[in-house]
Regions:
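Bacterial N-terminal signal peptides
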Residues: 1-5
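Sec/Tat signal peptide C-region and signal peptidase I cleavage site
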Residues: 8-12
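N-terminal secretory signal peptides
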Residues: 14-55
């Protein structure tokens, strides 16, 4: 894993964003109430899942999130972390925050 460098992702406090080289995946890593979280939004996708969870009246299926527990979820969100101004995380490189790391690969973005 590469250490987080100021010249890599855009960073403000404990929030920074980045995108895949294709621009199809945009991610943000941040701390909330002392816990680290990572979220990635897909610009274009073809889901294999179709059942929206009960209680989710917002957008669902285009955002994935992982918290300090390490459990990944499809997020029910009313916003986006997509920002075309975010720097690119090149394939094979990684960023970390609070015990969570995201690695960019040609096959996608993996955050654990």
């Amino acid at each position: 894993m590469l250490p987080l460098l100021a010249s890599t992702p855009a960073r403000a406090g404990d929030y920074f964003g980045f995108q895949s080289p294709t621009g199809n995946i945009h991610c943000a890593m941040y701390t909330f109430d002392g816990n680290a979280e990572a979220r990635c939004d897909l610009r274009s996708y073809t889901p294999t899942y179709t059942k929206r969870p009960a209680g989710c009246d917002l957008d669902w299926g285009m955002a994935f999130a992982v918290g300090s527990s390490g459990k990944g979820v499809l997020a029910c969100v009313g916003d986006t972390v997509r920002d075309p101004g975010n720097p690119v995380l090149p394939y094979g490189e990684a960023v970390s925050l609070g015990g969570i790391s995201c690695v960019s690969a040609k096959t996608g973005m993996t955050c654990t």
